[in-house]
Amino acid sequence: MTWLLLAEAGVPEGGLFDLDATLPLMAVQVVLLTFLLNALFFRPVGKVVEDREGFISTSRADAKQKLAQVERLEADLAEQLKGARQAVQSVIVDAEQEVDGLYREALAQAEAEANRTKEESRRGIEAERESARAQLKGKVDQLSTTIIDRLLAA
C-alpha cells in the first residue's frame, strides 16, 4: 500500500492535457490499429464491395443486352407472324376461289345433266305419244272398218 501512496505522490497534478509517455503510446496504438483494420477488414470488405459492384454492373449490362435481344426477337416474330397471316389469308382466298370454281363447274354439269335428262324424257314422252297416236289411229281405223263392215252387213 505504501507503493501506491508513493506512486500517487510522485505524479504532479496536470492540466487539461498531460504530455507524458501515454500520448505517443496511444498514437502508436491508433496507427497500428488503423493499419491492422485496414489490412484485415477494410481492404477485404472493400474488395467484396467492388466485386459486388462489378457483378451488378455486368449483370445490368447483360440484362440490357438480353432485353435488346428479346425485343429484336419479338419484332422478328411479329414480322414472321404477320407474314404467316398474310400467307394463310392468301391460301384461304385461293382455296375459296378454287371451291367456287369447282362449285360452278359442278353446278354447270348438274344443270347440263338435268337438261339432257329432261330433253331425253321429253323425247321419250313425245315418242310414246306418237306411238300411242299411231296405235290409236290404227285401232280407230280397224274399229271404223269393223263398224262399217257390220253396218253394211246388217
Swiss-Prot record:
TM spans (from-to): 22-42
Example of a GO cellular component annotation carried by this entry: proton-transporting ATP synthase complex
Keywords of the record: ATP synthesis, CF(0), Hydrogen ion transport, Ion transport, Membrane, Thylakoid, Transmembrane, Transmembrane helix, Transport
InterPro entries according to UniProt: ATP_synth_b, ATP_synth_B-like_membr_sf, ATP_synth_b/b'su_bac/chlpt, ATP_synthase_B_chain
Compartment(s) where it occurs, according to its Swiss-Prot or TrEMBL record: Cellular thylakoid membrane
Topology class, membrane: Single-pass membrane protein
Keyword Transmembrane: yes
Signal peptide: none
Pfam families: ATP-synt_B
UniProt-recorded Gene Ontology molecular function terms: proton-transporting ATP synthase activity, rotational mechanism; proton-transporting ATPase activity, rotational mechanism
Family: Belongs to the ATPase B chain family.
PANTHER family: ATP SYNTHASE SUBUNIT B', CHLOROPLASTIC
NCBIfam families according to UniProt: PRK07353.1
Known role: F(1)F(0) ATP synthase produces ATP from ADP in the presence of a proton or sodium gradient. F-type ATPases consist of two structural domains, F(1) containing the extramembraneous catalytic core and F(0) containing the membrane proton channel, linked together by a central stalk and a peripheral stalk. During catalysis, ATP synthesis in the catalytic domain of F(1) is coupled via a rotary mechanism of the central stalk subunits to proton translocation.
Assembly with partners or alone: F-type ATPases have 2 components, F(1) - the catalytic core - and F(0) - the membrane proton channel. F(1) has five subunits: alpha(3), beta(3), gamma(1), delta(1), epsilon(1). F(0) has four main subunits: a(1), b(1), b'(1) and c(10-14). The alpha and beta chains form an alternating ring which encloses part of the gamma chain. F(1) is attached to F(0) by a central stalk formed by the gamma and epsilon chains, while a peripheral stalk is formed by the delta, b and b' chains.
Name listed for the protein in its UniProt record: ATP synthase subunit b'
Gene (UniProt): atpF2
